[in-house]
């Protein structure tokens, strides 16, 4: 059962927010939008830092709809509706990038936010100079962001997805762009300058050694209760990353608190452990309570595509209850057990897309993980109801992933792995899934 199905089954609609209580460190949600879906007017958003809501909006997963030509486009009307409800309840930090959603995320986010006074929202966007990192192109990208948002300043500006000193020097250090960004910060056009990190411990330590030179105002890291101590190959445990930033008194922005949705849609046996402790709470609420329980956290980003996601997260942060020691221990137990499942650690960020050969890489991984979670991944032909499960698996695979976009079309070019911030062995994972599909087709399990 995914997050949307759980929320509908549990009856956790917007009206439930009416009982949200105020906590000591809160900010009142501003007026300007009308009451929608039974949500209470105003609201009280938890804060660790004055003026910044603990729940931040990640703008990489805006809802999509069919355009005039049949292709998917951002559903601007729904984006506006989501932003209205978020703003009404104190969500004021919006994180986007020139790279997100085919370059359209900034435009859609700007259209929604510019209906509000500039002092009501905090803009976080990025220097996503992955393919052309020349000085001129980097400056142009920065100025385009200012122009799109019709603003004279960016509140939080990030060097996008750095894995270590080599990437930093190539894209920023050797081009002269850092001097430009530092001048922009001095002039007030950049209020806070930081970076988002994906990489190993050595790379992180190298970047933090630059703090005395550049003074990082904040750092964005991947942090959730699994990655806290189980970040996996070529990544760094969030416990270490957060610990370094905490000691240096640098505010932390959290990305992937749900690990790409995996912590809201986990194996049934693990979900039951959390539901036994809190039958009325969503699986996602556990992850967001974990992320919000650390005092150095500036904001926790969530890519809330649907209103149910936004409402669920608002329930968590409008009446915030930090995890106690027993709950922390329970989550670490769940995390340890989760590591025994052969899930692909894909977060669905789509950085690997488009594949030059048309393969739906995130879709294939999602299908595989969803079936593992649901217990419909058969490992041997002796399992009860094997024939029925096998047939259903193959039919559902063809329905979820068009034949021309399936794993057997991978030619092992490796371009996807170069772009993957999780450092996944994508080719190996696709080959493994393709071999499994073939074994089902040939009935050779």
Predicted regions and their residues:
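Glycine/proline-rich, positively charged
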Residues: 65-66, 132-253, 258, 265, ...
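Short catalytic-loop micro-motif centered on adjacent basic/acidic residues
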Residues: 93-100, 191-196, 299-301, 420
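Conserved beta-strand positions
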Residues: 57, 96, 125, 156-159, ...
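Structured C-terminal cap/extension of enzyme domains
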Residues: 215, 240-445
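Conserved, mostly hydrophobic/aromatic
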Residues: 57, 94, 109, 123, ...
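N-terminal binding-site loop/beta-alpha segment at the start of enzyme catalytic domains
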Residues: 2-121, 165, 180, 186
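Structural motif corresponding to the early beta-alpha repeats
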Residues: 100, 116-135, 139, 160-161
């Amino acid at each position: 059962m995914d997050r949307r199905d759980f929320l509908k089954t549990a009856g956790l609609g917007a009206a439930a927010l009416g009982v949200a209580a105020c906590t000591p460190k809160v900010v009142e949600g501003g007026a300007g939008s009308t009451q929608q879906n039974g949500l209470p007017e105003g609201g009280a958003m938890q804060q660790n830092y004055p003026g910044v809501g603990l729940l931040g909006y990640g703008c990489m997963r805006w809802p999509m709809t069919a355009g005039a030509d049949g292709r998917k486009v951002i559903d601007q009307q729904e984006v506006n509706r989501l932003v209205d409800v978020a703003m009404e309840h104190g969500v004021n930090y919006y994180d986007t990038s020139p790279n997100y959603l085919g370059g359209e995320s900034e435009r859609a986010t700007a259209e929604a936010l510019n209906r509000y006074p500039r002092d009501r929202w905090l803009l976080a966007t990025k220097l996503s100079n992955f393919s052309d990192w020349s000085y001129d192109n980097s400056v142009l990208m920065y100025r385009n962001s200012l122009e799109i948002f019709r603003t004279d300043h960016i509140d939080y500006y990030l060097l996008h997805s750095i894995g270590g000193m080599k990437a930093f020097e190539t894209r920023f250090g050797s081009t002269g762009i850092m001097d430009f960004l530092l001048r922009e910060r001095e002039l007030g056009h950049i209020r806070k300058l930081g970076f988002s990190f994906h990489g190993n411990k050595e790379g992180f330590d190298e970047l933090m050694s630059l703090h005395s030179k550049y003074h990082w105002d904040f750092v964005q890291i991947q942090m959730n209760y699994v990655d806290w101590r189980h970040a996996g190959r070529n990544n760094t445990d969030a416990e270490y990353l957060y610990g370094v930033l905490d000691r240096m008194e640098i505010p932390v922005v959290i990305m992937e608190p749900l690990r790409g949705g995996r912590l809201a849609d986990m194996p049934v046996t693990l979900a039951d452990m959390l539901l036994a402790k809190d039958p009325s709470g969503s699986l996602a609420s556990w992850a967001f309570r974990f992320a919000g329980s650390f005092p150095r956290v500036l904001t926790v980003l969530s890519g809330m595509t649907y209103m149910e996601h936004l409402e669920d997260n608002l329930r968590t942060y409008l009446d915030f209850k930090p995890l106690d020691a027993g709950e922390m221990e329970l989550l670490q137990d769940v995390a340890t057990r989760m590591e025994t499942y052969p899930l692909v650690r894909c977060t669905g960020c789509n950085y690997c897309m488009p594949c030059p050969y048309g393969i739906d890489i995130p879709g294939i991984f999602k299908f595989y993980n969803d079936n593992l979670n649901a217990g419909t991944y058969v490992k041997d032909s002796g399992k009860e109801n094997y024939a029925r499960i096998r047939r259903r698996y193959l039919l559902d695979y063809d329905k979820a992933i068009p034949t021309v976009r399936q794993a057997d079309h991978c030619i092992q070019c490796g371009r996807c792995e170069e772009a993957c911030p999780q450092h996944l062995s994508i080719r190996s994972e696709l080959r493994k899934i393709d071999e499994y599909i073939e074994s089902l087709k040939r009935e050779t399990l």
